[in-house]
Amino acid sequence: MPDTNSTINLSLSTRVTLAFFMSLVAFAIMLGNALVILAFVVDKNLRHRSSYFFLNLAISDFFVGVISIPLYIPHTLFEWDFGKEICVFWLTTDYLLCTASVYNIVLISYDRYLSVSNAVSYRTQHTGVLKIVTLMVAVWVLAFLVNGPMILVSESWKDEGSECEPGFFSEWYILAITSFLEFVIPVILVAYFNMNIYWSLWKRDHLSRCQSHPGLTAVSSNICGHSFRGRLSSRRSLSASTEVPASFHSERQRRKSSLMFSSRTKMNSNTIASKMGSFSQSDSVALHQREHVELLRARRLAKSLAILLGVFAVCWAPYSLFTIVLSFYSSATGPKSVWYRIAFWLQWFNSFVNPLLYPLCHKRFQKAFLKIFCIKKQPLPSQHSRSVSS
């Protein structure tokens, strides 16, 4: 945790000002994530696989604003001594919430990767509520196992009167392992899922361009095939009529009848081909438009995930690097500068940004928010109503 001794030299007015702005951040985190949770409760249309993971993320970020920051303000700015029990509770809860937030981001990225790379299998095999709840619980269990046991065990390593920070802060290798589990692996996984999403989109876009006019090709091939069959049948009828010995009159009648039959056959085949071609062309155009809409939706999704990855890296990389560097110093001489405190706060700032990056960019959540605030889109007046009013 940040060095409380560095706040002793601050004036009371400065501390009150800082406490006010920190409280605003905590309130903004609670408000933004509470809206996401409320939207999930109010709107039943949100209760599908991806929205459950958004809910899990919002819960972890919400309690960052409820527990982590409110306990941090009096301890750091006003030198409130927690005591051992409250200190252990705060550390365990704070690390649990922040790590769960990170792992929920990984889970959401993985879910989006499955929906883009294999949409059919995603829709048919991943709809069970039990599987979704199992994944949500697994996030919290893994998040606790990363830091929780070490915080409890290393509490006996600390000296009396030391700061409220984990006892393993003086062991660089433990910090390296926890940073690897909290930051490095999640960043690699989220980057991997995003790259695969972009690769799948590129392949789909390339395939869509190559098959931009599949209906025209099918029509031309059908028409050519039926025309060829019509000509072939006419030739066969003509050759058959010349080979049969008969009188000149009967032969001429036979030729006329064969020509009329071949022309009718050709006209019927062309008519059938044109009808089949029109059906195949309309079906292919509709299919192409549907694929184009899905491709645009997937592109927007990929862009939002790319922004998420960048924000996540910016919010977590500085603190992970600082903790490893500070582990080489003793707790008394560690240079915990203002940059360390900024890096520390960036983790909590990520909990404020998450509801803006995820649900607020999701159309279903936007509709749910409009429902919460009782905002309805006003329909445009029709021409009939305008004429009546005039």
UniProtKB/Swiss-Prot annotation:
The chain crosses the membrane at residues 20-40, 53-73, 88-108, 132-152, 173-193, 305-325, 342-362. CDD domains: 7tmA_Histamine_H4R (cd15295). Pfam families: 7tm_1. GO terms for cellular component: dendrite; plasma membrane; synapse. This is Histamine H4 receptor. The keyword rRNA-binding does not apply. Induction: Expression is either up-regulated or down-regulated upon activation of the lymphoid tissues and this regulation may depend on the presence of IL10/interleukin-10 or IL13/interleukin-13. The keyword Transmembrane applies. One of its GO terms (biological process) is positive regulation of cytosolic calcium ion concentration. Glycans are attached at residues 5, 9. Expressed primarily in the bone marrow and eosinophils. Shows preferential distribution in cells of immunological relevance such as T-cells, dendritic cells, monocytes, mast cells, neutrophils. Also expressed in a wide variety of peripheral tissues, including the heart, kidney, liver, lung, pancreas, skeletal muscle, prostate, small intestine, spleen, testis, colon, fetal liver and lymph node.
